[in-house]
A protein has these predicted regions:
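Catalytic phosphate/metal-binding cores of nucleic-acid and nucleotide-processing enzymes, i.e., regions
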Residues: 1-88
Length: 88
């Protein structure tokens, strides 16, 4: 399965650079190992979440909920893929 997720600008470049290899997310999407995610960079703005046009894809390699609040999971990501910049 594929998931499209928002990611704040302050974290996005660290994912691109390989410094961040996990995401803590609310598990409202029933994530599974092997699922793919596309992270869409942006920031909250006056008209909702404002996207920059940069996206990057990855694969979920491990899921754990140890030590997290109920309903949250830590998604380990790998196979960080293509960075797309779309200014439109």
């Amino acid at each position: 399965m594929h998931h499209d997720l928002k990611l704040f600008t302050k974290y996005f470049q660290s994912v691109v650079d390989g410094k961040i290899r996990s995401q803590v997310r609310y598990n409202d999407r029933n994530y599974h190992i092997g699922d793919t995610i596309t992270l869409h960079e942006g920031q909250p703005g006056l008209r909702g979440f404002e996207y920059t046009g940069r996206t990057i894809s990855a694969r979920i390699s491990y899921i754990d909920d140890f030590g997290l609040n109920a309903g949250y999971v830590n998604l380990s990501i790998t196979d960080i893929g293509l960075l797309i910049i779309d200014k439109d």
